[in-house]
């Protein structure tokens, strides 16, 4: 007789800001709820733009979530009866999140994560490249460029209406007042302050 294994998997939803990542995460998790599956959602404490204890899309759709400070906080929860685990804004967690989502999948959970693939400079946003590599399914969403209306794959950070400098901090949580979607042609990263002084 053959043995059957109940194995979980990882689904990764990624793209620029305003591409609908949280919206898609909420949609997939709600389908699990409709199917009478036990669903638990986590979000990083740093993301308090709309609500501390809910995943909220830019369109206002929301789902209850557990606010956590570190990726290890996920393992402190009793997940023994949980079928589906959602994690929003995964790029804000430490690199240990990669091992944690793999462990959750190995324990039979369906893990659905969402987060940015690139930072405001257009560079890979760690640990998303590793999450994408270990995922069984990767969905890359695009927004619409705020300048020309074409497909947008990048996130433009604006400080007082001007492009952020290359040496600005990577993590700065904001919404539409400090970020907008841009295509490759209209994505701008200003030179560092020291480069400007040399000119």
Swiss-Prot record:
GO molecular function annotation: ATP binding; thymidine kinase activity; zinc ion binding
EC category: transferase
Residues forming the catalytic site: 89
UniProt subcellular location: Cytoplasm
Domain of life: Bacteria
GO CC field: cytosol
EC number assigned by the record: 2.7.1.21
NCBIfam families assigned: PRK04296.1-1
HAMAP family from the UniProt entry: Thymidine_kinase
Protein name in UniProt: Thymidine kinase
Organism listed in the record: Staphylococcus haemolyticus (strain JCSC1435)
């Amino acid at each position: 007789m053959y043995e059957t294994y109940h194995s979980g998997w990882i689904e990764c939803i990624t793209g620029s800001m305003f591409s609908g990542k949280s919206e898609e995460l909420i949609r997939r998790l709600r389908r699990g709820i409709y199917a009478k599956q036990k669903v638990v959602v986590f979000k990083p404490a740093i993301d308090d733009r709309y609500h501390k204890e809910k995943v909220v899309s830019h369109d206002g759709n929301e789902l209850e979530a557990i606010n956590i400070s570190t990726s290890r906080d996920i393992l402190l929860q009793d997940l023994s009866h949980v079928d589906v685990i959602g994690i929003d804004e995964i790029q804000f967690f430490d690199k240990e999140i990669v091992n944690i989502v793999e462990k959750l999948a190995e324990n039979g959970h369906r893990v659905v994560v969402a987060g940015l693939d690139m930072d405001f400079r257009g560079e890979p946003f760690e640990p998303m490249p590793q999450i994408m590599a270990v995922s069984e399914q990767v969905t890359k969403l695009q927004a619409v460029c705020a300048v020309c209306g074409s497909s947008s794959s990048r996130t433009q950070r604006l400080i007082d209406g001007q492009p952020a400098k290359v040496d600005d901090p990577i993590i700065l949580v904001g919404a539409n007042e400090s970020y907008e979607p841009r295509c490759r042609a209209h994505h701008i990263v200003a030179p560092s302050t020291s480069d400007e002084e040399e000119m």
